[in-house]
Design a protein with these regions (language model features):
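Single conserved hydrophobic/aromatic residue that forms the stacking wall/gate
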Residues: 2-13
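Helix-loop junctions on the outward
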Residues: 11, 22-41
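Central hydrophobic cores of alpha-helical transmembrane segments
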Residues: 14-21, 123-135
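Juxtamembrane "helix-exit" motif on the non-cytosolic side of transmembrane helices
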Residues: 25-33, 83-93, 136-146, 199-207
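Membrane-helix boundary connector in multi-pass membrane proteins
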Residues: 30-34, 116-125, 134-147, 167-176
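Loop-to-transmembrane alpha-helix initiation sites
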Residues: 37-41, 142-157
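Internal/C-terminal transmembrane anchor helices
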Residues: 177-202
């Protein structure tokens, strides 16, 4: 079956790449000079932009609509709008309000996009997004941005879905450990990550009251 992206999906690839490059070049390099390690953060998003370009060029159709996980995906699609509402509820005003085009908002939207069109997930991009969620969790503590719990909470079920689909796609191949063991290990890993997120959230409850 032809897995090359349709014209519509090709436009999605281009917009996602441009958005990632915008975050890298404008958000971090141009306006984020005062932030520590802004160049590394810019490189992180530039690499993700390159992944979208790579998928487009080699016609790796990592976005093919399957109608799986639609409810969860729609929830994540709404998160970029929830972010500023969350900021307003915390009493923030512009420019402290988290906007829909900030890194964590874009990361949540991208996770939703990959869930809604998850016939063939780019596992490298999924790993980058999972890593960004961990970075976002640290920002809750160091920068007092509890909005980033939205990304941290969404990544645990998404992580399980991404890697479960990846394991299933290789189910017919001889692997060590077996797919059943890999799936069990994945469940344990997600439980551990989810428990650590929950512990961090409970530990930082005083941060919510102080903001």
């Amino acid at each position: 079956r032809d897995r090359s992206p349709s014209r519509g999906l090709g436009d999605v690839y281009k917009r996602q790449a441009m958005l990632n490059f915008w975050i890298a070049g404008i958000y971090y390099l141009l306006y984020g000079e005062q932030r520590e390690h802004n160049d590394m953060l810019a490189l992180f998003w530039a690499i993700m932009g390159c992944i979208w370009v790579y998928d487009l060029v080699v016609k790796h159709a990592s976005l093919q609509r399957t109608h799986n996980h639609t409810g969860f995906a729609l929830l994540l699609f709404a998160m970029p709008l929830v972010y500023p509402l969350f900021s307003l509820a915390l009493g923030r005003t512009f420019p402290m309000v988290t906007t829909p085009v900030m890194p964590c908002s874009v990361a949540v939207f991208t996770i939703g996009l990959m869930l809604a069109f998850s016939e063939r997930i780019n596992i490298v991009l999924a790993m980058f997004l999972c890593h960004w969620a961990l970075i976002g969790l640290s920002k809750v503590y160091f920068f007092g941005i509890p909005e980033d719990y939205l990304l941290a909470c969404s990544i645990v079920p998404a992580l399980y879905i991404f890697f479960r689909e990846y394991i299933r796609s290789n189910e017919g191949r001889p692997t060590k450990p077996s797919p059943r063991v890999l799936n069990a290990l994945l469940v344990v890993l997600c439980i551990i990550i989810g428990a650590s997120f929950a512990f961090t959230m409970l530990h930082q409850l005083n941060l919510f009251t102080d903001v």
